[in-house]
Amino acid sequence: MPAEFLQLNNLGFVMICTEDFLPNHNDCKNSGDHCDLCVQKIIENGITDVVFDLHLLVDWDARRTLESHYPDYIGEVLFSYEPEWGFEFHEALREAGWSIECALESFGEHHGPAVTWLYRLYFENFSHGFLGERERFADVARDLIAKGVRVWALGNASQEWVDCARTTCPILGEINGVSASYEYHLRKPNIMIYRDFLSKNGLSASSTVFVESDLRSLKTAQRIECASTKLFTL
């Protein structure tokens, strides 16, 4: 096994960042060779399971839910609200298992009726936020599957989000499994969600790669107990 795979963290798994995994978007978009090389390296290095962040496979944007009703500046009243008790705060709670009803009630306790109504409209038009799968990552996932590598998805999402994503993203029905934060009542980058995911699916940590969209999860793992975590380029 190559040296970079021996420099594993205390949990035994390797994380990579998408900027390293696919350093040039145009390379992947216009040439199959670049993505094939990534897949080939995964196979050569004995990786049996690749876990994509859910949001890499699903084309989602919350702002689309209000676009057909209001100009952007109206939507920003909701989406850019203050961090404490605002939109992002309550969406994080939903991703950790809160229901829509609980989120709306809590939001209404901290904001006026106009903004709360926008939040309610966001839920009513929730499915409009999805545009299908992200082609470049879905293509890589299919290449991995074709080569015999098991592919999974794990990310921060509510049950409603996952349900809608499944109806618009064929790749989610082709991979080995989809897990989301609401099931664990934990959100990335909490290290326990990775441990629980590996245990739940019976995966071997030393042969699993997590493909992340940013470095927050990696940095959190290092800060807690994973100082020897290796970030590398496939």
Q: Language-model segments: which ranges?
A:
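Short, acidic loop-to-helix structural element flanking the phosphoryl-transfer center
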Residues: 120-152, 191
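Active-site neighborhood of HAD-like aspartate-dependent phosphohydrolases
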Residues: 11-18, 38-86
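Alpha-helical elements of Rossmann-like donor-binding domains used by nucleotide-donor carbohydrate transfer enzymes
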Residues: 64-69, 88-89, 102, 106, ...
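Asp-based, Mg2+/Mn2+-dependent phosphohydrolase catalytic module
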Residues: 2-29, 34-53, 138, 158-159, ...
